Structure formats: C-alpha cells, structure tokens
C-alpha cells in the first residue's frame, strides 16, 4: 500500500467508528422525541448482519485521543485540499451536543439553578479500563453542573488523579471519593458516565439508602428501566422518553 492510502486507511477507520457513534446518538435524540426506545431500535438494527452490534450503543459522547483527533485531521486535510466535509462536520457537531444531553436532563428534573444540589458521578475516564480523560464526557457534564451552582462528588477506579491534577484541577466544586457507594452519600442524584465493569450490577438497595433522592441518570444505558422502576427509582436514559422510563 502506498503512503497516502495507508494514512487515509488509519484516519478513515477511526472516523468511521466515530460516525457510527454519532449516528446512533442522533437516532437516540430522535427516539426521545417520537416516543421510541433506542435500546429496542439498537437491538432491531443490530440483528441485521449488514449492520451488526459494534459501536451502535447510544451514550453521552465519545472522547479520548484517537476518534476526535482523526476526525479533525480528515476535516482539516480535506479543507487544505479544497474540499469541505459534510458528514464529518456533523459527526463532530453531534458529539459536542451529546455531551450536554445529561446536563440538560438534570436541569429538566431539578431546574436551571442547581445551587444547594449535589450530584454523584460514576466514572471520569472517556472509556472503561483507562485513566485517560482526554475529551471525556465527564468533563463537560461536571462543568455544566457546577457552573449552575451544583456540587459534584466523583468516583472513578483509575482516573481520579488525572481529574485532580489536570482536567478538573480548576473546578473547586468537585469532591473525589474512594468508592462507588461513598460517593452517593447525601447526593441528590447519581449520574453514570463511564461504563466500568464494577458499575454494571450494583446493589440498588445500597444506592437508594445513600442517595437523598432515588434518582439515576444513566449516560450509557447500563441498567434495566423496569427493574429500577419496581425498586422505586426515577431513571433517565439516553434515547428513551422520560414517560417510557416511568
């Protein structure tokens, strides 16, 4: 393979995956508005072998270094050579907006002024099994909450140091905790941001006992809405109308 084609192959692979994520997040936003459940839509389209299930999970946006960097590299390279990208620009725009979906849901539930409210964050890294917080959704979510007067308590198995010394070092309204349960104490709601394995099957009785209000915002659609409703939780997902959640 020639050098130009090899470079394009690398950029295109990551841009394609980023596109799948943003596309599914776009669909999730439509689902919320028309009364559909994006989780069911995902299962339906994924059963088509031409599509499959890889990278079609809705969420609160992609981060890290590779996807953002390579999408931006293709956009810039195209511009340098006289071509204006359209799909890739939209991929970036959707991803930017998706990181604001959870804060908007919080505001819809608790109001624009979050003074006196505390939110427990599960997960800081842009994905599980890393301490990498580059362009992580948690940064946007936390900053959007604290600028409205909220306090945030955060827990991540690996990324706490990165948050403290770099990505959230100037945010004085963030408290870091040492476990997924201690972070919940006296919080008005829990927000799942990173789908770490240890968050997949938590003790919901313990969660309910520690939270002020049994309210969960799930940025990765990890939990079962009907089960949580039966346990007395208010549960807000990505791509599912709050009416369906209830």
Question: What function would you assign to each model-found segment?
Answer:
Residues 1-246:
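Structural/interface elements that position substrates and couple domains in central-metabolism enzymes
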């Amino acid at each position: 393979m020639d050098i130009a084609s090899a470079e394009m192959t690398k950029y295109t692979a990551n841009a394609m995956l980023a596109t799948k994520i943003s596309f599914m997040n776009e669909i999730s936003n439509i689902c919320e508005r028309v009364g559909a459940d994006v989780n069911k839509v995902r299962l339906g389209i994924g059963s088509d072998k031409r599509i499959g299930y890889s990278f079609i999970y809705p969420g609160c946006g992609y981060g890290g270094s590779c996807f953002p960097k390579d999408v931006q590299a293709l956009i810039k390279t195209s511009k340098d050579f006289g071509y204006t990208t359209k799909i890739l620009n939209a991929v970036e725009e959707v991803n930017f907006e998706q990181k604001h979906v959870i804060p908007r849901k919080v505001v819809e539930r608790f109001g624009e002024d979050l003074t006196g409210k505390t939110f427990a964050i599960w997960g800081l890294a842009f994905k599980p099994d890393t301490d990498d917080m580059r362009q992580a959704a948690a940064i946007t979510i936390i900053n959007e909450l604290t600028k409205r007067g909220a306090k945030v308590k955060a827990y991540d198995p690996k990324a706490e140091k990165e948050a403290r010394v770099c990505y959230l070092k100037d945010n004085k309204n963030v408290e870091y905790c040492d476990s997924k349960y201690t972070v919940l104490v006296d919080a008005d709601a829990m927000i799942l941001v990173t789908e770490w394995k240890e968050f997949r099957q938590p003790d919901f009785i313990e969660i309910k006992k520690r939270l002020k209000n049994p309210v969960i915002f799930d940025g990765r659609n990890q939990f079962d809405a009907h089960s949580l409703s039966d346990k007395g939780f208010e549960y807000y997902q990505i791509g599912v109308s709050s009416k369906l959640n209830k």
